């Protein structure tokens, strides 16, 4: 088992890691939040993986393989977990925190494909094809991230029927999420985009550990949607008035997930 700080793993990449732009659009900037307290020691790797539904379905010898070859990293907001156009050396999961998958151009302007909250795993498509990663993976908030090496992933795919079944469902659900994200970004107004971005983070098929509450600030949500914190606040206030969610400090409680997922769909 290996436990490291996120910045210590720069040697995995052919060029130094750099903090990623945290906003997709110039108007998304906001005053920095208070820094979080220093993280405590991480639990054993077996405890972290034991909370993953796919891991619990594996045979004991396959679980042992994962634990022997995988590792965990503690990452801070702004850390680049994986670079675009670097080899897809790992299948990546979020034990705790929030990541975003995005592309940035040379001027720093970007496009976010998806947010990945606690319990989410991603990158299986590129890992299966052993291709270069197609997007940057950036921590939006302090995150505990799990890494399964590409060779371990393929060994499981070749020998574990439960794992193969999980990956098939994962690919299917991820494709649906990306199609919906493109549709929403091009055809919905801002309020509906905020609602749909939130609803995606509560998708139990992809993110089973989210639960009814999500620890996220309005600034962090703005990084996912690509609009300013002030505009996010307006949209959230409207959704709260409709009874779809309840707001607290750096937390969103979903009261009616169906209503949240339906919001703005009449625009299509």
Positions of the model-derived regions?
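Positively charged, low-complexity/disordered segments
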Residues: 1-14
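Cyclic nucleotide-binding regulatory module and flanking cytosolic helices
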Residues: 18-77, 126-127
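Cyclic nucleotide-binding regulatory domains
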Residues: 54, 79-141
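Cyclic-nucleotide recognition modules
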Residues: 62, 68, 113-176
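Short aromatic/basic micro-patch
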Residues: 91, 115, 147, 215, ...
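Polybasic "coupling" helices that flank or enter modular domains
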Residues: 140, 158-226
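Phosphate-/nucleic-acid-contacting segments
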Residues: 201-268
